[in-house]
Amino acid sequence: MQPTQYVGIQDIKSLGTLLDKVAEHKGCGTSSEGGKASCGSSDGPADMAPEVWEKVKNHPCYSEEAHHHYARMHVAVAPACNIQCNYCNRKYDCANESRPGVVSEKLTPEQAAKKVFAVASTIPQMTVLGIAGPGDPLANPAKTFKTFELISQTAPDIKLCLSTNGLALPDHIDTIAAFNVDHVTITTNMVDPEIGQHIYPWIYYQNKRWTGIDAARILHERQMLGLEMLTARGILCKVNSVMIPGINDQHLVEVNRAVKSRGAFLHNIMPLISAPEHGTVFGLNGQRGPSAQELKALQDACEGEMNMMRHCRQCRADAVGLLGEDRSAEFTTEKIEAMEVAYDGATRKAYQELVEQERQAKSAAKAAEQQELAQMADQSGLSLLVAVATKGQGRVNEHFGHVSEFQIYEVSSAGSKFVGHRRVDQYCQGGYGEEDALETVIRAINDCHAVLVAKIGGCPKDDLQKVGIEPVDRYAHEFIEQSVIAYFMDYLERVRSGQIEHRPRGDADIRQGAYTSVQSTSAAA
């Protein structure tokens, strides 16, 4: 496979250079269809209405492809909550846990707006501002909508989102629509109050605390009503569901059907996070989360009904950056107060045009590799999972030792698709390999036949091979899906020639708890 020639975003050093390159390309990439010009992926999928594509094409949560290129941020202006979930424990000054409901500091709407402008100026591919806590945005409506007002006045190009439990949602539909909030996420874990009572100890509704089945029934009815009202307004709705083995894991298939029938655009089934150190009811009671195999099986079962989101990172309520990274420490209130923030919409637009060129090149590369696969692959049903070390842009561009998460792709004769991610402790710490960390890495990708990396040291390479995971660095800096397909074709050839024997892999762990990582540029390990 020949190296792809492209203009890398990381090569842009100044605004002058950026604008020169945009002018050179006239803001558009060129597709592989007879050289016909098109602005990145602006045409959208054939099965998606143009107005929907405009809403999702650069939204990293609503588009799996977009999450490789575009960033999001959350602002923590909503500390209060109107329900209690057994999987949640809100923390307001926590820096070392990566999960919903956790922030390092609470913000006023004015502080939040300045933070958004600072981030947007520093990370021009940040396209989405979401309010997701640490409580519920609609249990804090004044702060939530004041924040939206301040941001929309100065930065109308930034998409506004909120994530809610849905209890107060029907009361705020008009205001949500008035602020042009095009994306709302509702966390829906049940459509049967008998099951819901084991997830929600209480809700606070109409100045009264409700418990048991009554609480679950009210919450369910309000969630379904809110979803129906949003879809009637043309607002895209994503439904988040937490998979809790033994409680709602089988029931989530029914949830999937119920939300689809009410117009939900996307369903995101997430694994329960129940590490005891988080202090949740489920965590302290020993409720386990699902294995990687269990989670994928449920997602696969629901995929035939509607679009499934598999790239969720269950991020903090103050997350900043690409999905899978968190740059919030760069934008603390103290640091932002010292900044001179000037919002430059023209610069952001020019930068994002370059992102679209990169996406167009990626799509063309995948299509070319897919065509070759169709010509040579058999129909035996053989499929593999492949782990990928990446730091963004849809490329195999991360050193094995510096990875804090692997992206997981499933590949077969039908092509490749993203099916999830696995958090890991960084193997390279202070320039040296940590054997304990390597063990967690192996457990996290144990169901994968290979791991694609930009670079890997001899010791971890040997250890991976011993457990049957093939480390592959020959696709360094190439597009991920193109590389995954190329690896699969090579794998098929080796199986056919008798060089290797295909053997199924086992299950893998889903990482929980805080990250254990250090910032290191060492190439050791």
Curated annotation (Swiss-Prot):
Catalytic class of the enzyme: lyase
EC id: 4.-.-.-
SUPFAM superfamilies for the chain: Nitrogenase accessory factor-like, Radical SAM enzymes
Coiled-coil segments on the chain, per record: none
Swiss-Prot/TrEMBL induction comment: Expression occurs only in the absence of ammonium and under low levels of oxygen, and is strictly dependent on NifA.
Pathway(s) where this gene product acts: Cofactor biosynthesis; Fe-Mo cofactor biosynthesis
Every Radical SAM core domain range: 67-316
A Pfam family it matches: Radical_SAM
Residues involved in S-adenosyl-L-methionine binding: Y87, G135, T187
Keywords carried by this UniProt record: 4Fe-4S, Iron, Iron-sulfur, Lyase, Metal-binding, Nitrogen fixation, S-adenosyl-L-methionine
Cofactor(s) of this protein: [4Fe-4S] cluster
Cofactor binding annotation: Binds 3 [4Fe-4S] clusters per monomer. One cluster is coordinated with 3 cysteines and an exchangeable S-adenosyl-L-methionine. The two others probably act as substrate.
Listed CDD domains: NifB, Radical_SAM
BP GO annotations: nitrogen fixation
GO molecular-function term, one example from the UniProt record: 4 iron, 4 sulfur cluster binding
Binding locations of [4Fe-4S] cluster 1: C81, C85, C88
Region named Disordered: 503-525
Family from the record: Belongs to the radical SAM superfamily. NifB family.
Function: Involved in the biosynthesis of the iron-molybdenum cofactor (FeMo-co or M-cluster) found in the dinitrogenase enzyme of the nitrogenase complex in nitrogen-fixing microorganisms. NifB catalyzes the crucial step of radical SAM-dependent carbide insertion that occurs concomitant with the insertion of a 9th sulfur and the rearrangement/coupling of two [4Fe-4S] clusters into a [8Fe-9S-C] cluster, the precursor to the M-cluster.
Protein name as catalogued: FeMo cofactor biosynthesis protein NifB
Organism, as annotated: Herbaspirillum seropedicae
Gene name per UniProt: nifB
